[in-house]
Amino acid sequence: MLRILLINSDKPEPIQFFQKDKETNDSINISVITRSCYAPLYSHWADHVYIVDDVTDLTVMKSLMLEILKVGPFDHIVSTTEKSILTGGFLRSYFGIAGPGFETALYMTNKLAMKTKLKMEGIPVADFLCVSQVEDIPAAGEKLGWPIIVKPALGSGALNTFIIHSLDHYEDLYSTSGGLGELKKNNSLMIAEKCIEMEEFHCDTLYADGEILFVSISKYTVPLLKGMAKIQGSFILSQNDPVYAEILELQKSVAQAFRITDGPGHLEIYRTHSGELIVGEIAMRIGGGGISRMIEKKFNISLWESSLNISVYRDPNLTVNPIEGTVGYFSLPCRNGTIKEFTPIEEWEKLAGILEVELLYQEGDVVDEKQSSSFDLARLYFCLENENEVQHLLALVKQTYYLHLTEDHMMNQ
């Protein structure tokens, strides 16, 4: 009997994968650790469901694991969400279970540890400082030079991430209710780094046994933070693009520094005006937003299926069959409130090059979400003859896009 522990929230891809696995394979025992609000997603198919208030609480998770192991040992621990990755690494290392360990997970989730290690290894990163309270931000700005980026050391999706342009800007944010999001009330580690002018790329990989099984390198239409709450996206670069080989070498250097051997990686890279490539961040997960579906449309593979197969040491079932052309996606931003109307889907579908329109909300939906890099109304997937056509299509999308609300809920704006 193969025993698997899944640590997850409501992330649908692992749920669908392991539920199907359970239904078709009698020799698998699947236990799940999740929050109580997500338990109904698992209770009808998982063998055991364990409830915790916070999967990031390592003390609680270790104690729970000791109880669970009385039933029998686990062969694999699967942790696919940003909040569960560090916990998964800790539990594997502490209990001697195969898979990515605590140190690798720490470097790929804690941005302060990440950038400190990269700097020690001689891999270029923007100048940064540790910040333990928001009142220390002015000193960080003076030392690094304004503008700076301030964000939690642990987190994803650009949640509670701020570009602060000057001391006056900081004081305005500090004195405004909600101006610094949850940074003021959270007693958690932060990182401040120099905000630089650049182009931004992302490199998405799958590793198994220390080898790269798959790589896709893409360019964002606008740097992520500057594109927040605006139409943005990315497109996959040709392997013949001069920057492709440079980014791939940088990816390999990071993987060696962090001892990445198995699973997915999502690396963000900056190219400065001088042409220097520096590492932004790397995550031990599949890229968010429309990235995985974009890659599926280009290469005819499922990053999720292959990644989850790797997590339980199976054949990744990875046969790459790329289509011709430049494939990418645009994210159309959503806003909090009750959705009255938005651009008819037919207006987007008739644009030349559009492959699919993915709607995340419908008219009449009441939306109350935190602002993040994946807070989207819709995503448009496209295939064009070459990347020179991307900006033209983006301009057409901007002309057609509108979103009208009947009321705004400001708490999470």
UniProtKB/Swiss-Prot annotation:
Mg(2+) binds at residues 268, 281. It catalyses: an L-alpha-amino acid + L-arginine + ATP = L-arginyl-L-alpha-amino acid + ADP + phosphate + H(+). ATP binds at residues 141-202. Activity is maximal in the presence of Mg(2+). The use of Mn(2+) or Co(2+) decreases ligase activity. Mn(2+) binds at residues 268, 281. Residues 115-312 form the ATP-grasp domain. Gene3D superfamilies: 3.40.50.20, ATP-grasp fold, A domain (3.30.1490.20), ATP-grasp fold, B domain (3.30.470.20). It is an enzyme of class 6 (ligase). Its cofactor is Mg(2+); Mn(2+); Co(2+). Keywords: ATP-binding, Cobalt, Ligase, Magnesium, Manganese, Metal-binding, Nucleotide-binding. Optimum pH is 9.5. InterPro entries: ATP-dep_AA_Ligase, ATP-grasp, ATP_grasp_subdomain_1. GO terms for molecular function: ATP binding; ligase activity; metal ion binding. The keyword Ligase applies. Its EC number is 6.3.2.48. Optimum temperature is 37 degrees Celsius. Catalyzes the synthesis of Arg-Xaa dipeptides in an ATP-dependent manner. Has strict specificity toward arginine as the N-terminal substrate. Homodimer. This is L-arginine-specific L-amino acid ligase. It comes from Bacillus subtilis. The gene is rizA.
